[in-house]
């Protein structure tokens, strides 16, 4: 028997939608006298469970190279909702005599991460080779993105897995539990100098407010999304055609959001919006995009990170509830001195 469950707030920062799930009948709950009943709060990161995630990374750090051959470090990014974004430092040793490294072992590393354990829930997996910078850490998110975006060959280094299983709470895909994944694999010498200033742009109707976010990264505001699920947006394809006329070689990553100011305000906002609101296969567009023997590439990526008509709504604070919690922290109340 199944009954509707939800909506409820989740750890990605949205109200998951109602779905039918099997009913479990509980007849007894046994406990010791004076039992401690653990609970936590979740919502848009960071929340209390953020500390659990940080501790898990610390506990498992030494195990990562043993479980995933060639992988030195992983970072399931809390600000992006954990499962939507996994950063990893891997190895590139397959052809050590080559003049310049290119991603080969890194692809094996990425498929290994997607093939077992909790890392298999990841949606975007971004990998860099330790050989290019022995001091590189994927816990330095801005530094890691800069390293990767300097080295990504966008005609070669994007590897999509389509129509596959997804985290149940991720509504960016084509249906419940189904969507796509992608590997960004970066190795070798830098391919470009990342731009650090905002260029002048001509934008089509509905797109506005271009914002420089970080070296090589640009954010635009787009019109409200109105397409059905599992469908390309003609407006995004038109945007790419127009942007292809501009000199954007220094911007390998362009993000279209509902609110460019909010998205570009901080790394936390950028990561949350970009990676929780996009499906790699459906929402990755590109300047000068092409498909050759089923491999897709471009000269600059454009990620559609707008809220879609089929997404779960974002969590919002309720003033009355916040007031009640604040009152618990007053002198003489249970949470005084704690929060």
Name every feature range the model reports, one short phrase each.
Residues 1-339:
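Charged, compositionally biased interaction regions
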